[in-house]
């Protein structure tokens, strides 16, 4: 199993950012290494970390996304805020000091650049548009996603969409989900 430093060396050695150069971990190692990296402190508030949070939902990845560049040690209140979308992946990645995040595969397929992914995508793979509405992502029908959006007061901002495309970031919301 490679360490965080080894993953960074691999990235530097090949001269480009390769998020998948980070090794795929078991669930147990994902949690252990996440907590070790943060010294058991929440990366957002500095409190006691109790959850190894997937920055982007693990269901978005065919392999489960158990890589350290998709992990953040969070306390319970910050974990809840991250799950319901009040703390964004962009903010969490910055707090972790990660400059090579693991973007969900559907982001590239939709034509999103890494910076657009970080700026506009929530934990569940939905796109937040410039007008504040939300273009549903591939997990929109997932019970966990819908419960999180509802708990965060964001479910009413979603509109029904066909294909998930990068053009949805700035396009007007024709129909919003009621």
Q: Where are each of the predicted segments found?
A:
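Histidine-centered nuclease catalytic patch
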Residues: 41-73, 82-93
């Amino acid at each position: 199993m490679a360490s965080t430093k080894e993953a960074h060396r691999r990235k530097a050695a090949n001269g480009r950012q390769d998020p998948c150069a980070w090794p795929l971990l078991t669930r147990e190692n994902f949690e252990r290494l996440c907590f070790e990296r943060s010294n058991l402190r929440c990366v957002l508030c500095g409190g006691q970390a109790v959850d190894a949070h997937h920055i982007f939902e693990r269901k978005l990845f065919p392999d489960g996304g158990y890589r350290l560049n998709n992990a953040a040690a969070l306390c319970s209140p910050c974990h809840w805020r991250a799950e319901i979308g009040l703390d964004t992946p962009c903010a969490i990645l910055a707090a972790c000091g990660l400059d090579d995040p693991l973007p969900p595969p559907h982001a590239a397929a939709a034509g999103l650049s890494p910076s657009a992914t970080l700026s506009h995508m929530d934990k569940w793979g939905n796109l937040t548009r410039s007008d504040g509405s939300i273009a549903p992502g591939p997990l929109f029908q997932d019970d966990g996603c819908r419960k999180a959006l509802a708990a965060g007061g964001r479910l009413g901002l979603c509109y029904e969409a066909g294909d998930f495309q990068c053009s949805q970031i700035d396009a007007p919301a024709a129909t919003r989900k009621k």
